[in-house]
Amino acid sequence: MPRYLIQRNLGKVTLQEVEEAGRRSKQVREASFPDIIWEHSHVVQTKDGMRTYCVYAGPSVERVKAHAAAAGLPADEVFDLVTDVDPAKL
């Protein structure tokens, strides 16, 4: 299944709000998007606020974006994830 890296610019939110958004994303996925897999997310602090980088697998970029919209989350940039580099395997 194709994998995607989603950049979400969340703005000036708290870590608690980020966690609430994650719970909402999980609930929407479980209820309406069983064909989407949320692998993990990284949360970073920028000068403009919180940003997340989320790795998802799904049948299409459109389906992943539909999940984000249904969860009320931005999907500011969505990239095709080509591969992972694992230093333990180099």
What feature does the model see in each segment?
Residues M1-F33, I37-E39, T46, V61-H67, ...:
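Short S/T/G/P-rich N-terminal loop/turn motif that feeds into the first structured element of a domain
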Residues M50-Y53:
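Short active-site oxyanion
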Residues V55-A57:
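Short hydrophobic/aromatic beta-strand micro-patches
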Residues L73-V85:
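Conserved short beta-strand edge segments in small beta-sheet-based binding/regulatory domains
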